Amino acid sequence: MELTSKEFKSELILEVQACLQLAVPLVITQILEAGIPLLDGVMMGLLNSQALAAGALGAVTFSTLASVCRSILSAVGVNVANAFGAGKIDQVSRATGQGIWLAVTMCLPVMFIIWHFDYILLLTGQEESNVLLAQTYLRSIVWGFPAALGFCILKEVSSALNRPQFLTVITVAGLLLNAVANYVLMFGKFGLPALGLAGIGWASTLIFWLNFIAAASWICFDNYFKDYQLDCALHQFDKDMFIDIFQTGWFLGLQYGAEIGVFTATALMMGWFGTETLAAHEITVETESFVETVSIGISYAVTMRVGQLRGQNDLKSASRAGLVCIALVTPFVSIVALIFWLFPNYIVAMYLDTSNLDNIEIVKTATSFLAAGAIVQIFYSIQTIAAGALIGLKDTKVPVLITMFAYWVVGLGGGYLMAFTFGWGAIGLWLGLILGLVMGAMLLTGRFYLLTSEIESG
């Protein structure tokens, strides 16, 4: 039945309200979570430029591996959202349990890789002094990895159940404590040894565990969650559901691994241009990552919203939810892009003393990177939300192929050609990222449009 114009506007307003109700706390939480690595990057710069460069290697390594694992675990949220939408309360606890077992399965091998990642960094041609310093960071933050995955599962479940607000409170406290812990452990206050870059890693480990314990405690004592019997999750191993979550998560891990892996590979190639270029790249990436948390938060919301509506078999509304979220993020990222273009010096000044002549090359390079980063974050935001909507539909296989083609063939391949073959230098790598993200945004958004058009017509 066709909707009248008034009815359509009414449903559209209701969908915007529903998306915002879920998205706002998730965006705030995501911003606060991203505040930890951003704060770490700023405080690395307080040590010296080498600590900032080495910290970039360590941070991007940990972030890449952690993000892949979190992406795999996002399949838990999709399953919980489907069960919640369908009113299958018993399936909520069962899906949560399988997610916990999956996290346990991944934890030890990934921690082993992080511990020994210095060998891989050396093979990529990084300066040995930077690698040795990055190793101290990696071998301290690695102990927070299990807690980071645990918090991820609790975030997925609470978001799928429309109860993410308490996460904001926890992450506010975590960010404030992280600043204090960084300062104390970096510079050796209150009788503690000055650990330098390693101190930042230990501070992150502490915050990961405190956040996880706080979230688990909140869920245990919040009456809202009692009907879902999440405390029994570990006692309900379901082989079929475990395999289903793993299969869905595996493709999500590949998709996000391909995406984030491009940024990792780009950082490694930036290292070939020297410490100053790598430091400038770290400034741009950290700032970019912080801004993109808004898009990532909205993408979590659209995944849960589309997943819930899919569970209700209301696929027309699921289509509307995806398009509404894409429309919501576009004005924000456009404004931020203008800030990147107009005020790059103020952004760089958050990390380094721009009046220090020793930093002049870093400032100049970072300014050019930020101009390219402005374009990057517009298309990154669009493709991230489109990908989130497709996850809610449990469409994962084709998006993996799209992501690999867009990022690795178009993005990294094009960036390498421009940077090294054409001789454009480090900025060529950022131009390659722009090409890859434009391609990814177009293809993923187009696929969501095609799938939902088929749904509506069918």
Language-model regions, residue ranges each:
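Short alpha-helical transmembrane segments in multi-pass integral membrane proteins
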Residues: 1-23, 80-146, 192-250, 306-375, ...
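Transmembrane helical elements of multi-pass membrane transporters/channels
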Residues: 21-40, 140, 174, 207-211, ...
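Helix-terminus/linker motif at the lipid-water interface of multi-pass membrane proteins
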Residues: 31, 35-53, 121-128, 184-195, ...
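Small-residue hotspots at the loop-to-helix junctions and early N-terminal turns
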Residues: 49-60, 138, 201, 275-290, ...
